């Protein structure tokens, strides 16, 4: 029984031919989406740069200058907060680590704003272990 069904299936396939009908996929959108292909990670044979670039933002470049206005002094005295002008490209994490590196104090959090003149101002709230007034005296802007 098996050989005859196999033979009849082969006969049917031979009559049908190899170029059968292919079901066409109906496109419902006019935009063609490129299929996602395999993207291998790069493994370069040699470095393209002979020497890596120096650190563009170190602690001394991040903190530009302390701000010693009356409102900033009020923040120092009452809010345990230091106020600095910082580099426009620096972020809060970089500012926090720069203050730790330069002045050996831990910051609780950092608030930043960009002033109308295009510079960035940072309010660095210190932890209760440190006194902002002492740090400001040590820095020399009081």
Curated annotation (Swiss-Prot):
Matching Pfam families, A to Z? Ribosomal_L23, Ribosomal_L23eN
Per the record's keyword annotation, is Phosphoprotein included, yes or no? Answer: no
The alphabetical list of record keywords is:
Cytoplasm, Ribonucleoprotein, Ribosomal protein, RNA-binding, rRNA-binding
Cystine connections? none
- Stored Gene3D superfamilies: 3.30.70.330
According to its UniProt entry, the protein's GO biological process terms are: translation
State where the protein is found: Cytoplasm
| InterPro entries on file | Nucleotide-bd_a/b_plait_sf, Ribosomal_uL23-like, Ribosomal_uL23/eL15/eS24_sf, Ribosomal_uL23_CS, Ribosomal_uL23_N
Q: Which GO terms describe its cellular component?
A: cytosolic large ribosomal subunit
Give the protein's function: Component of the ribosome, a large ribonucleoprotein complex responsible for the synthesis of proteins in the cell. The small ribosomal subunit (SSU) binds messenger RNAs (mRNAs) and translates the encoded message by selecting cognate aminoacyl-transfer RNA (tRNA) molecules. The large subunit (LSU) contains the ribosomal catalytic site termed the peptidyl transferase center (PTC), which catalyzes the formation of peptide bonds, thereby polymerizing the amino acids delivered by tRNAs into a polypeptide chain.
Q: Which NCBIfam families does the entry link to?
A: PRK14548.1
Tell me the protein family, please: Belongs to the universal ribosomal protein uL23 family.
Return the protein name.
Large ribosomal subunit protein uL23
Organism name = Candida albicans (strain SC5314 / ATCC MYA-2876)
As recorded in Swiss-Prot or TrEMBL, the protein's gene is named RPL25
């Amino acid at each position: 029984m098996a050989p005859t069904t196999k033979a009849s299936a082969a006969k049917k396939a031979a009559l049908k031919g190899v170029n059968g009908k292919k079901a066409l996929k109906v496109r419902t959108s006019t935009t063609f989406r490129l299929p996602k292909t395999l993207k291998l990670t790069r493994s370069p044979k040699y470095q393209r740069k002979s020497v890596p670039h120096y650190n563009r933002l170190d602690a001394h470049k991040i903190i530009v200058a302390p701000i010693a206005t009356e409102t900033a002094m009020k923040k120092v005295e009452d809010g345990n907060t230091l106020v600095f002008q910082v580099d426009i490209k620096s972020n809060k994490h970089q500012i926090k680590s720069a203050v730790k590196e330069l002045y050996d104090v831990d910051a609780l959090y950092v608030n930043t704003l960009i002033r109308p003149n295009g510079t960035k101002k940072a309010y660095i709230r210190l932890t209760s272990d440190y006194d902002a007034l002492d740090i400001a005296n040590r820095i020399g802007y009081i």
